[in-house]
Amino acid sequence: RDLRMSRGLGDVYKRQTYADRYTGLAKLVQSDDSPDCFPFEICNYPYSVYQNLFQSLDGVIDFTTDDWADYKEAIDKFNWGGKNYCPIMSLTPTSYLWYRKSVVEEAGLDDPWELYEKGEWTWSTFMEMARKFSDPENGKYVLDGYNPENNFVCTTGTPLVSLEGGKLVSHMNDANIEKCLDMLRSFDNTQEQLRYPRDTENSWTPSYNEWADGNTLFFEDGSWRYEETWRKFKKKNKWEDDEVNFVPFPQMDGADKYYQSMKQDSIMLVAGAKNIDGYKAWIYSNLVASNDPEIAKVGREQSKEEYDWSDTLLDRIEMMNDPKTFSGVFDFKNGIGQDIASTENQDNPVEQLTKGPYMTGESYTSFRAQYQGQIDARLAELNKTVE
């Protein structure tokens, strides 16, 4: 509260349910009662700008200064129509592959983190490990989570939809994306049965218990999964500090760089916002805080004391979050309209491109043939608005 007041932001905030957040924001904008800030979400960008919910930061923030040097390359990838809207203040991998050390050892597998450190954590080593561990007749599966397929696609270095020169560009015909989704197709229970069958066994929900019981080798999720779930299993089962581990998604064989899907910490300036100076001050306060070593030190100690993080895992996270560790990939495929690209379900054209092969075993090319025309038409429609 005090920081908001000192920065001129006042002490008023609007509470909205998650499901109604954009509907509620639109009503506030239309009634000339816009809030100043709104959290950025790539799943609705740049469509949210097309809907006139946000305003450009050109003339508000100068992204050419040294303040933004670490994130300038990423910020440029979010340019829409020649304008900047996203003040990225930090980046972190969208998801990790979580695993248990003892499960890997008992299966006679190499430790994934050690493979990563040696530069040997690739698609091919991942698949070798997957096929060795998999034993569906005895309930042993390799991978679980809500969105592993999207993270894998980004390791090609090419998103399905990018922003280039301020416009949306389709890469649905990219050979490496096709290769990636052909690999993921093998995970379905109609193929090699490598993924946990959450659709038939758990009402489409990933199973934390199966991972904790050692029946699922990898679980795709963000760092918050440790705080919300894994640390509780650790305490209950009296695991050692080095039992819970994570590794980034494997590098594509032969890739020129190590690409990874990256999540952005960014706050948008709402259309019609009255307190531009307050917004700007808030952004710079967040930027300074996110890169302040003393604040990071306090946060680290809090993570250890309150959430049982180990120094080993925290060191790993710090390395993962360093802008120099990975080449960040940002996929704007879901930001072209909820009617054809909602992340809330997989039964829409955009989600079918990736979840279709992974969850049904049907080929990526069959889904592409079915939906490419509709998606390309939407991209052209949106691009026309910024010509």
Regions found by a protein language model. Name each.
Residues 16-22, 40-94, 247:
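Hinge/lid segment of periplasmic solute-binding proteins
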Residues 22-34, 46, 51, 104, ...:
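Short helices/loops that flank or line small-molecule/ion binding pockets
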